[in-house]
Amino acid sequence: MRTNFEKFTKRDSVVNEQGEQWQERRDRMKKRHKQQRGNSQKREWN
């Protein structure tokens, strides 16, 4: 029982680390997408 619990906690910590990395990557992608959309709009206006 105790070994099982330790295994679960280890897996949860790994998932948490991946989740934080994914949040950072998603934020970066959103920012990049906004910049690209802004640039395309400027091009259309010109």
Curated annotation (Swiss-Prot):
InterPro entries named in the record: Phage_T7_Gp1.1 (IPR013232)
Region annotation Disordered: where it falls in the sequence:
1-46
Q: Which organism is it from?
A: Enterobacteria phage T3
Its job: The function of this early gene protein is unknown.
Alphabetic keyword roster: Early protein
- What is this protein's record name? Gene 1.1 protein
Family matches, as Pfam families: Phage_1_1
**What span is annotated as the signal peptide, if there is one?**
none
Report the superkingdom from the record.
Viruses
Q: Which spans does this entry mark as compositional bias, Basic and acidic residues?
A: 1-14
